[in-house]
Amino acid sequence: MGIQQITNMCSHLQNASRARLGLTSLPNTKYNLALALALHRAGFISSITRGGPHPPTPEALMTYEPEPVTSANVATRRLWVGLKYWNEEPVLKELKPISKPSRLVTASLEQLNRVARGFPAGYMKGLQLGECLFVNTDRGVLEVREAVERKVGGLVLCKVK
């Protein structure tokens, strides 16, 4: 997995959330899409749409049909991510990458189980209320509780508050 892409995505989404943006764009890569879908399943972001360099209109977000990706337009394709807010506060407050290009952090099932229950394991602190930890497994990007439920370990990507 492109760890540098994941750290850039974490930084970009955190900055967009702090700037109170409703819609932001990311490069359309399979790693960014996998993490964005996991964040959407966890309820941190409201929508994900593939598109071009210009954002789709808010009314067309639900019925928007993006043009297919070809070798001629692959460099201009973007993921348009809708951010969520609750009582004037961003739902996505902090996105902290755990694995870095200089240090890849992998976790076994036992370590993930400890972290999910709130205890530290290795480089990872235990999860507190309202936090999620995302793990890249052979079954895709999963939240740590899903990974424990499916009994798989993997590369720890980021912690979200």
Swiss-Prot record:
GO terms for molecular function: structural constituent of ribosome. Keywords: Mitochondrion, Ribonucleoprotein, Ribosomal protein. Disulfide bonds: none annotated. PANTHER family: 40S RIBOSOMAL PROTEIN S15A. Component of the mitochondrial small ribosomal subunit (mt-SSU). Mature N.crassa 74S mitochondrial ribosomes consist of a small (37S) and a large (54S) subunit. The 37S small subunit contains a 16S ribosomal RNA (16S mt-rRNA) and 32 different proteins. The 54S large subunit contains a 23S rRNA (23S mt-rRNA) and 42 different proteins. Belongs to the universal ribosomal protein uS8 family. Component of the mitochondrial ribosome (mitoribosome), a dedicated translation machinery responsible for the synthesis of mitochondrial genome-encoded proteins, including at least some of the essential transmembrane subunits of the mitochondrial respiratory chain. The mitoribosomes are attached to the mitochondrial inner membrane and translation products are cotranslationally integrated into the membrane. This is Small ribosomal subunit protein uS8m. The lineage of its organism: Eukaryota, Fungi, Dikarya, Ascomycota, Pezizomycotina.
